[in-house]
């Protein structure tokens, strides 16, 4: 395999975008692009514009396919799931718990607040990608992932059994 896929890529935006996109495209044929920019890539239209900026930043003749994701927010319109499923370039919706990582301030405080979107994702077979960390003053930093599994992931699986989820520790060990 001479040019594999990168399944978790942060390209950022602005000056960093050109450098990281060119470097990535030399080694990888495709990459799943994370949506945690400022502002977040939360709509298909925003993902389309970001994808265009990525492609424009590549050297001429570069063969590289950015696979776009949307940033799940508690205000996301469930109709956005339908647009994502029909887009041909959005491969999933990424959930960042609020305050868990870089640019996660627009993230969700609980997946319970996103039920309508998650129901549409289940119906349309859209992948939910999880940044699986619990946040809050009651959470020990060393227990963030295990508490996320207990408080968010396991209830999510019970409520939405057909929802496609991607979370490495949960897949590997639970």
Enumerate the language-model features and the residues they cover.
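Aromatic/hydrophobic pocket-lining residues that form π-stacking "cages" and hydrophobic walls in ligand
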Residues: 20, 50, 117
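Short helix-capping segments at alpha-helix termini
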Residues: 56-63, 158-160
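Histidine/acidic residue-rich metal-binding segments in metalloenzymes
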Residues: 79-95, 101-174
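Generic short alpha-helical segment signal, independent of protein family or function
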Residues: 52-55, 59, 89
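Divalent metal-dependent hydrolysis catalytic cores, especially in the metallo-beta-lactamase
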Residues: 7, 21-45, 61-73, 89-103, ...
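Short, acidic/polar
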Residues: 14-23, 75-86
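Glycine-rich loop at the start of a catalytic domain that most often binds anionic cofactors/ligands
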Residues: 44-52
């Amino acid at each position: 395999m001479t040019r594999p896929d990168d399944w978790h890529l942060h390209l950022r935006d602005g000056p960093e975008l050109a450098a990281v996109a060119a470097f990535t495209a030399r080694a990888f044929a495709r990459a799943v692009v994370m949506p945690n920019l400022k502002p977040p890539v939360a709509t298909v239209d925003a993902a389309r514009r970001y994808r265009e900026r990525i492609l424009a930043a590549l050297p001429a003749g570069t063969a590289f396919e950015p696979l776009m994701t949307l940033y799940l927010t508690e205000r996301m319109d469930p109709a956005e799931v339908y647009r994502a499923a029909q887009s041909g370039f959005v491969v999933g919706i990424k959930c960042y718990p609020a305050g868990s990582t870089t640019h996660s301030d627009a993230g969700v405080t609980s997946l319970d607040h996103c039920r309508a979107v998650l129901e549409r994702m289940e119906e349309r077979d859209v992948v939910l990608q999880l940044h699986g960390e619990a946040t809050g003053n009651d959470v020990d930093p060393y227990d963030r992932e295990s508490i996320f599994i207990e408080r968010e992931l396991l209830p999510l699986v019970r409520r939405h059994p057909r929802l496609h989820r991607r979370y490495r520790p949960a897949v590997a060990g639970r």
